[in-house]
Regions:
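Carbohydrate-associated surface elements
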Residues: 176, 198-199
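Nucleotide-sugar-dependent
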Residues: 232, 285-291, 299-317, 326-338
């Protein structure tokens, strides 16, 4: 089976979608599947299980994106996105040439950016080739895509509706997103829908055999791995930490923030005098993250405070694969909260400072009491399991 994959960010080193897909496609059975990846950047990937077709971006258009954001013209930024103008039109032309000169069995498009799906739609209409549309994040139901004018919001709906009507297979990372999509377009969906979990390169670990039920070095190490921003802040956690430190001055605890951190949260760390127990690591490479996964006793995830929140943060699946306990700060109806409850981890409301503080104290003083989480849940993200599900779907088209 030969396919063209429309994935603009496939080769971007720091892109979560790219990291996952660079592990996914090379692990498909080489004797049955080959892929031509249409992407923006030229990153040399070892191996020969797929080939890349680089479609350069129009850099001049990217400058418009910066200008629109600076001026607050969000509707132009999100209609559908700047990649549509800087890359997708060229990608359609290049993909058309490939289809006309090679035997292509299906098209596979991946968001983000959402405009990749519009390339898939145009190719489907032009050539009639089966089309797989894969979601990583919501499109029309995405609360980050904030519009000032209803006209642009309606355009978002109309574009996603084309996907619902013409895609042969629509893939989602979780059932919450699938169900929300079905609520919007169920009466016009002609293809099939399925949930394919994210894939990870991390071998699943069993904490009962790998890690003792006590803090390593007798100091509890909590790690948050990922970017924090105005939409995903650590302020509530920091207030809870200050509350606990006031009650227990000699707190045997270290908190790592690995990744970019929001400027206001950095100010809070200084104002609350938390520098002795908070380590702001900053942004590091994917390989450098490894030691923080390995050497943590407890993982923290902070979700965006949106409704609906249908996002599945990629860091969460990596947390699961290490089998260590996790606590989250999230809305109770979010995907993150559902996953944490399902796996017997802990989740707290955004305003629950006392609850978070009490939980951290419990983790410090009685670590084994919080180690009740499902340590096998990470197996659903294993390479073999995810690849098998995808292959079963492809065989039906």
């Amino acid at each position: 089976m030969n396919s063209i994959v429309i994935a603009p960010t496939f080769l971007k080193p720091s892109c979560a979608v790219g990291q996952i897909e660079r592990h996914f496609f090379p692990n498909l059975p080489k004797e049955y599947y080959s892929h031509i990846i249409c992407a923006e950047d030229d990153l040399k990937i070892e191996g020969d299980r797929f080939r890349t077709h680089i479609v350069p971006e129009r850099k001049s258009v990217l400058k418009l994106d910066l200008l629109f954001r600076k001026l607050g013209w969000r509707d132009l930024v999100y209609s559908p996105d700047i990649t549509y103008y800087s890359w997708c039109r060229r990608a359609f032309k290049e993909a058309s040439k490939l289809i006309e000169n090679e035997r292509i069995n299906y098209i596979h498009t991946i968001n983000n950016p959402v405009s990749a799906h519009l390339v898939g739609y145009r190719l489907k209409m032009k050539y009639g080739i089966p089309w797989i549309a894969q979601f990583y994040d919501p499109w029309y139901n995405n609360p980050v895509r904030k519009y000032c004018f209803d006209y642009f919001k309606k355009k978002d709906y109309e574009r996603e509706k084309l996907l619902a009507e013409y895609a042969d297979i629509i893939l989602f990372p979780n059932y919450e997103l699938l169900n929300a999509f079905n609520d919007l377009y169920g009466n016009i969906i002609n293809g099939s829908m399925a949930v394919i979990p994210f894939i990870t390169e991390i071998p699943c670990r069993n904490t009962l055999t790998t890690f003792p039920n006590k803090c390593m070095n007798d100091v509890l190490t909590i790690s948050h791995i990922g970017t924090l921003s105005a939409d995903r802040r650590a302020d509530v956690f920091l207030l809870a930490l200050a509350n606990l430190k006031q009650r227990i001055p000699e707190l045997k605890l270290m908190v790592n923030f690995v990744g970019n951190m929001y400027s206001e949260d950095l100010k809070i760390i200084k104002e609350l005098n938390l520098q002795s127990i908070v380590n702001v690591v900053g942004k590091v490479s994917e390989s450098e993250c490894q030691s923080y996964y390995e050497n943590s006793d407890l993982f923290m995830i902070i979700d965006m405070n949106f409704r609906p929140n249908l996002f599945y943060p990629s860091k969460l699946l990596k947390y699961f694969c290490y089998g260590k306990p996790i606590f989250g700060i999230a809305d109770k109806d979010s995907v993150v909260a559902h996953e944490l409850v399902k796996t017997k981890n802990r989740v707290f409301r955004f305003e629950d400072i006392d609850g978070i503080s009490s939980f951290i104290e419990q983790a410090v003083t009685d670590y084994s009491s919080i180690c009740v989480n499902d340590i096998d849940y990470g197996s659903k993200f294993k390479t073999d399991n995810v690849i098998k599900q995808y292959v079963n779907l492809i065989e039906k088209i």
